[in-house]
């Protein structure tokens, strides 16, 4: 059976991991074994948090909409329900932007939604 020499392949693999570990502190950026563990953990966290970011932003938008709606005397759930009845199709991101940057326009949306209460 011929001898398998993996010098180039192994070196490339290690260099790739150490390149990904650039910026980590201490041994985590210098020693392959430790760097490999840190890189794997960093990639896991990045994968998880890309999904979590979507949930976090949705929660933030809902909180902002709820706060602005309560100032106008309506709860978030009432607002969303009334908007669906009135066929107002504005997503939560845009509603939150309106609530923060243009309260007058947000008040108009609330007014239109409250007309469809019945």
UniProtKB/Swiss-Prot annotation:
One MF annotation (Gene Ontology) recorded for this entry: rRNA binding
Give me the Gene Ontology terms describing cellular component.
Answer: ribonucleoprotein complex; ribosome
Q: PROSITE patterns under this entry?
A: RIBOSOMAL_L20
InterPro entries per record: Ribosomal_bL20, RIBOSOMAL_L20_CS, Ribosomal_protein_bL20_C
Domain of life the protein comes from = Bacteria
Q: Which SUPFAM superfamilies match?
A: Ribosomal protein L20 (SSF74731)
Q: Which UniProt keywords apply?
A: Ribonucleoprotein, Ribosomal protein, RNA-binding, rRNA-binding
Q: Which processes are annotated in GO (biological process)? A: ribosomal large subunit assembly; translation
Record-stated family = Belongs to the bacterial ribosomal protein bL20 family.
Q: What role does it play?
A: Binds directly to 23S ribosomal RNA and is necessary for the in vitro assembly process of the 50S ribosomal subunit. It is not involved in the protein synthesizing functions of that subunit.
What protein name applies here? Large ribosomal subunit protein bL20
- Species the sequence originates in: Trichodesmium erythraeum (strain IMS101)
- Recall the taxonomic lineage recorded for the source organism: Bacteria, Bacillati, Cyanobacteriota, Cyanophyceae, Oscillatoriophycideae
